[in-house]
Design a protein with these regions (language model features):
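Glycine-rich beta-strand-centered segment in the early N-terminal region that forms part
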Residues: 21-35, 50-106, 147-149
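NAD(P)H dinucleotide-binding glycine-rich loop of Rossmann-like/cofactor-binding domains
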Residues: 58-72, 102-183
Length: 233
């Protein structure tokens, strides 16, 4: 298989020809057809997250040691199955949930693999990701049928969409007449507006410092917008 790897932080990704893994047990080999680029990928490529105030969080502390393959927004086609893999068939298209846990700790057993205390199996972070022709997935439970959604959009859902959906579900009970402010109208903010509308919210206020993004928020369904740099904001 072909992967594009970080060999040195801040330098162009390097093409690598690697052995295509063979799935065993419950494993599923996916042929990647779409891979989103998250802003976190850019931070990992840099080698650190800027925390502000001169502070940095270096990704090597999370096990991101070059060479490794980025990509935690994967979508692909089932290419091969281990003998114990059930529930999917070769040729089916699936979104791949990238936040893979150990499967043994309490949070994994509760179905919350993204909170896994091991933190060492996330695709594109500690495990080879989707900037590759193939990805090995440990279990079919991480594969999601997104029939009816464009593949190029579906690949982002297990990152940006679940982030926003989780935040919205933490809101207190709201009525249809209540206002909800969305702070920041970039990619996640626009997804937030879509989800809020789907949940019946009509009074959505988009807030940003970029007028172009505020225009996009109105097109997405915000009722009004606020430029937070404006004197009357």
């Amino acid at each position: 298989m072909i992967s594009y790897q970080i060999v040195e932080h801040g330098k162009p990704l390097q093409r690598a020809v690697l052995e295509t893994p063979k799935p065993e047990g419950t494993e599923v080999l996916m042929r990647i057809t779409r891979a989103g680029v998250c802003h976190s990928d850019l931070h990992i490529w840099d080698g650190y997250f800027d925390l502000g105030g001169g502070r940095r969080f270096y990704v090597k502390e999370r096990g991101c040691i070059p060479p490794f393959t980025l990509g935690h927004e994967p979508f692909g086609v089932v290419e091969a199955l281990g003998k114990k893999a059930k529930g999917v068939k070769v040729g089916q298209k699936r979104l791949i949930f990238p936040w893979i846990g150990c499967g043994k700790c309490a949070v994994c057993k509760a179905g919350q693999d993204n909170y896994c205390v091991s933190g060492s199996r996330f695709l594109g972070v500690n495990r080879p990701g989707a900037y590759s022709t193939h990805v090995l997935v440990p279990d079919p439970k991480y594969l999601v049928d997104t029939t009816g959604i464009d593949d190029s959009f579906a690949c982002t859902l297990a990152c940006s969409a679940v982030t926003v959906y989780s935040a919205i579900n933490k809101l207190p009970a709201l009525g249809p007449k209540d206002e909800v402010a969305v702070l920041g109208c970039g990619g996640l903010g626009l997804v937030a507006i879509s989800i809020l509308r789907a949940k019946g919210m009509k009074n959505i206020v988009g807030c940003d410092i970029d007028d172009a993004k505020l225009t996009a928020a109105l097109k997405q369904g915000a009722k009004r917008t606020v430029n937070t740099l404006a004197p009357d904001a």
